[in-house]
Amino acid sequence: MVESDEDFAPQEFPHTDTDVIVNEHRDENDGYASDEVGGTLSRRASSIFSINTTPLAPPNATDIQKFTSDEHHFSMMRNLHMADYITMLNGFSGFYSIVSCLRFTLTGKPHYVQRAHFFILLGMCFDFLDGRVARLRNRSSLMGQELDSLADLVSFGVAPAAIAFAIGFQTTFDVMILSFFVLCGLARLARFNVTVAQLPKDSSTGKSKYFEGLPMPTTLALVLGMAYCVRKGLIFDNIPFGIFREDQILEFHPIILVFFIHGCGMISKSLKIPKP
């Protein structure tokens, strides 16, 4: 049977409050404007990093059908956009930072942990760049939001925790705090994916009025602090404030509580940071 163009025409579906928003290339640094036609959400209406405030149209039903029905080898890679590949470079940077921490642990050579800090900074650059590329190319992405969140978890959650462990935060209690920190980042990103459409928007720009909890990239402050400690030799036995209850079951480094506080800040709903 010959298929007509009508067979692949986009279909309109009634919109309800529980509809899942079409996946767009966005991250937690962005704001969004509601597209009243069809009740969907246009991608990247405005953010402090946006080139302009003009929203892009989300992928339509034809894009979704093409993405899900293509069963050829490497079809997923062919359907990714340039912005998606830049997001994956963010994930690569985070993973390479973790590998550099492992090399530092095995060899003790400080340039490896310095490299770990550098690759987290590089991941931050990719995190800001992916949305700009999507806007310049006027292309929305089906998997952009999920890729962004997963890459951010690796680069700004797991990698900083790996650096902390590598430079001396290695007691059982230290590791529990670092695990809590990573899980808070995971929960924060999951909450963002679910609630971003419900956050109050500025009526003139469509931009979210505030961050709910600390954004994941703010962990860069912890990374810079650890980079300073490495540069000054304040690692292992020289970690500031020493170790509490040394050689006991609950021994820990008091400064590790900074990770605990930051983790609590990421999952806080009462902490609302106004966007500029």
Swiss-Prot record:
Thermal dependence of catalysis: Thermally inactivated at temperatures above 30 degrees Celsius.
Pathway involvement of the protein, from the record: Phospholipid metabolism; phosphatidylethanolamine biosynthesis; phosphatidylethanolamine from CDP-diacylglycerol: step 1/2
Sites of Phosphoserine modification: S4, S34, S42, S46, S47, S50
Domain of life: Eukaryota
Gene Ontology CC: one annotated term: endoplasmic reticulum membrane
UniProt-listed Enzyme Commission number(s): 2.7.8.8
Needed cofactors: Mn(2+); Mg(2+)
Region (Disordered): 1-21
Keywords linked to the UniProt accession: Endoplasmic reticulum, Lipid biosynthesis, Lipid metabolism, Membrane, Microsome, Mitochondrion, Mitochondrion outer membrane, Phospholipid biosynthesis, Phospholipid metabolism, Phosphoprotein, Transferase, Transmembrane, Transmembrane helix
Topology versus the membrane: Multi-pass membrane protein
UniProt-recorded Gene Ontology molecular function terms: CDP-diacylglycerol-serine O-phosphatidyltransferase activity
TM annotation in the entry: 82-102, 163-183, 210-230, 248-268
Subcellular location(s) per record: Microsome membrane; Endoplasmic reticulum membrane; Mitochondrion outer membrane
Catalytic function, reaction form: a CDP-1,2-diacyl-sn-glycerol + L-serine = a 1,2-diacyl-sn-glycero-3-phospho-L-serine + CMP + H(+)
pH and activity: Optimum pH is 8.
PROSITE patterns in the record: CDP_ALCOHOL_P_TRANSF (PS00379)
Pfam family, one: CDP-OH_P_transf
Cofactor, how bound (note): Divalent metal cations; Mn(2+) or Mg(2+).
InterPro entries: CDP-alcohol_PTase-I, CDP-diaglyc--ser_O-PTrfase, CDP-diaglyc--ser_O-PTrfase_fun, CDP-OH_P_trans, CDP-OH_PTrfase_TM_dom, CDP_ALCOHOL_P_TRANSF_CS
Primary role: Catalyzes the synthesis of phosphatidylserine (PtdSer).
NCBIfam families registered for this protein in UniProt: pssA
Similarity field: Belongs to the CDP-alcohol phosphatidyltransferase class-I family.
Protein name as annotated: CDP-diacylglycerol--serine O-phosphatidyltransferase
Lineage of the organism: Eukaryota, Fungi, Dikarya, Ascomycota, Saccharomycotina
Gene: CHO1
